[in-house]
From Swiss-Prot:
Protein name: Sporulation-specific extracellular nuclease
Keyword Nuclease: yes
Signal peptide: 1-28
Enzyme class: hydrolase
Function recorded in the entry: Degrades both double-stranded linear and covalently closed circular DNA. Likely to play a scavenging role in order to supply nutrients under starvation conditions.
Organism (species): Bacillus subtilis (strain 168)
Keywords (A to Z) from UniProt: Hydrolase, Manganese, Nuclease, Secreted, Signal, Sporulation
Gene name, Swiss-Prot/TrEMBL: nucB
Upper taxonomic lineage: Bacteria, Bacillati, Bacillota, Bacilli, Bacillales
Sequence similarity: To B.subtilis NucA/ComI.
Length: 136
């Protein structure tokens, strides 16, 4: 009788696991998805992709008011380099940005074009919007 009950319990547990939909990790952790065009901005796109792969967040929580302070924090101690911009990920406009951001030297045309593109994409999103970045 005990073996039969244990078998029944095990079968019920397996059946329950198969029938209950599994939660998709991170499914509710963002509000919008932004598909960043790697072919259009290859240096900035590669930087974003690499920084995310190294453990930096792929989510940007928009906070425009704090951008200047976070930019100062993220670029502190990173010298300027003639002919290059310092690109940071997470971006300064993101709550996740600031001290500890990944910084890479990229050409100004790529960096500023990418910044303009992202700004246009997110212009209608209010502060607090959580944007998932996917580089493709």
């Amino acid at each position: 009788m005990k073996k039969w009950m244990a078998g029944l319990f095990l079968a019920a547990a397996v059946l329950l696991c198969l029938m209950v939909p599994q939660q998709i990790q991170g499914a509710s952790s963002y509000d919008k998805v932004l598909y960043f065009p790697l072919s259009r901005y290859p240096e900035t796109g590669s930087h974003i992709r690499d920084a995310i792969a190294e453990g930096h967040p792929d989510i940007c929580t928009i906070d425009r008011d704090g951008a200047d302070k976070r930019r100062e924090e993220s670029l502190k101690g990173i010298p300027t380099k003639p002919g290059y911009d310092r690109d940071e990920w997470p971006m300064a406009v993101c709550e996740e940005g600031g001290a500890g951001a990944d910084v890479r030297y990229v050409t100004p045309s790529d960096n500023r074009g990418a910044g303009s593109w992202v700004g246009n994409q997110m212009s209608s999103y209010p502060d607090g919007t959580r944007v998932l970045f996917i580089v493709q």
